[in-house]
């Protein structure tokens, strides 16, 4: 979840579904969406304009998100709270006493592993001095309407081990990275993001959109074998 903090007031930009209710309702702050070169959402909260660019890194198990404070008239903080499941894609997780809610130091961030049978997940940022506040807790009953409509289980509990918080100045950006591999420095995070977004094609017509979508079905297995996967969008 992303939260804007200004004048000791918090504005949560997230949107979650729980039984019978959507909370928080961050969609009301969305003013723009762009698909190319990478999915980008623009939020406006009063005098604050925040841009969010989401990027899966090619051939890596890594998600990167760049937040840019486009406009602000007073001191503004950004708070980032990751939610963790650590499960198979065909299962849902529920609150339990076995999950390890601790966070352990990593380069400009932390690493987490709820269960010993899973790999470490590295949560890092590109801005030196970003504070991580440990606050482990379970959030209950996230509801997935499409799963319920298909006759599957559709309620899940998610763990948060804490949140990142930093002050952003007008025009300043911060990159959040979630990866199975640790980034060696804040500079590396910036370089990986820049290189990855530079290789993205601009999806401006039917053919370019079709080529982009087709590439998502081509995967490379750990052993180096390249395959075309069926049903990927539904997983």
Q: PLM features: what roles do these ranges have?
A:
Residues 1-235:
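Acidic, mature catalytic/reactive cores of soluble proteins
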